A protein has these predicted regions:
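N-terminal, positively charged/glycine-rich alpha-helical extensions of SAM-dependent methyltransferases
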Residues: 2-27
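Class I SAM-dependent methyltransferase Rossmann-like catalytic core
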Residues: 25-38
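Conserved alpha-helix/loop element of class I SAM-dependent methyltransferases that forms part
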Residues: 36-55
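Class I SAM-dependent methyltransferase SAM/SAH-binding core
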Residues: 60-62, 66-116
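A short beta-strand submotif of the Rossmann-like class I SAM-dependent methyltransferase core
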Residues: 129
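Conserved small/polar residues in nucleotide/adenosyl-binding loops
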Residues: 153-154
Length: 154
C-alpha cells in the first residue's frame, strides 16, 4: 500500500489539500548517487573545516538518503558514521553501498526521522546534513540537534 502524506496549504485565503504518494520520491531518487544538490568536491570542501575527529568519533548523517555524501565522509574521516533517513528503501541501498566499499564495520544506515532522533543527548562528535535540514527547517534543526553534540569538555 502506498504511503501517502496530506499537505495542507493556507496562503492568501486559498486552502488546498493535496495527497501524494511518497513512494514516487523513492522510486525517482533511489538510483541516483545523491538525493539532492552537492558533489564529492562540495562534501570535501565542507569537511575541510572540521578538525579533531578521531577513530572514537561518532558522526550522524541526518537525511542521508542512499549515502552518496556519507560514503565520501567515511573515506576521508576516522570514526563511526550512522546515516539516518525516513525512507527504508534509501537505507537498504545505503547499507549495500557501505558494504560495496567495505565500510560496513563503521558505517551503518538506520530508518528514522530527523525530527525525533534516537541518539542519546551529547553523544555525537559531528552532525552532518547535506542538503536535508530544510525538511524540518534550518533554525529548528540547529536548535534541536545541538543537544546531541558532545560538550566541548569531552
Amino acid at each position: 500500500m502506498p504511503q501517502c502524506f496530506t499537505i495542507m496549504n493556507n496562503d492568501n485565503n486559498h486552502n488546498t489539500i493535496q495527497e501524494f504518494d511518497v513512494n514516487l520520491i523513492c522510486d525517482f531518487f533511489l538510483n541516483t548517487n545523491r538525493q539532492g544538490p552537492g558533489s564529492p568536491e562540495a562534501t570535501l570542501k565542507a569537511l575541510s573545516f572540521i578538525n579533531n575527529l578521531t577513530v572514537q568519533s561518532l558522526i550522524a548523517d541526518l537525511g542521508c538518503g542512499t549515502g552518496g555524501q556519507t560514503m565520501v565522509l567515511a573515506q576521508h574521516t576516522p570514526g563511526s558514521i550512522t546515516g539516518l533517513d525516513f525512507f527504508p528503501e534509501f537505507i537498504e541501498c545505503f547499507n549495500r553501498n557501505a558494504e560495496k566499499l567495505n565500510l560496513q564495520d563503521r558505517v551503518k544506515g538506520v530508518v528514522g526521522s530527523m525530527d525525533a532522533l534516537s541518539f542519546e543527548k551529547e553523544s555525537l562528535d559531528l552532525i552532518w546534513s547535506e542538503g536535508a535540514i530544510y525538511n524540518i527547517g534550518f533554525e529548528r534543526g540547529l536548535n534541536e540537534w545541538r543537544n546531541y553534540l558532545r560538550s566541548e569538555e569531552h
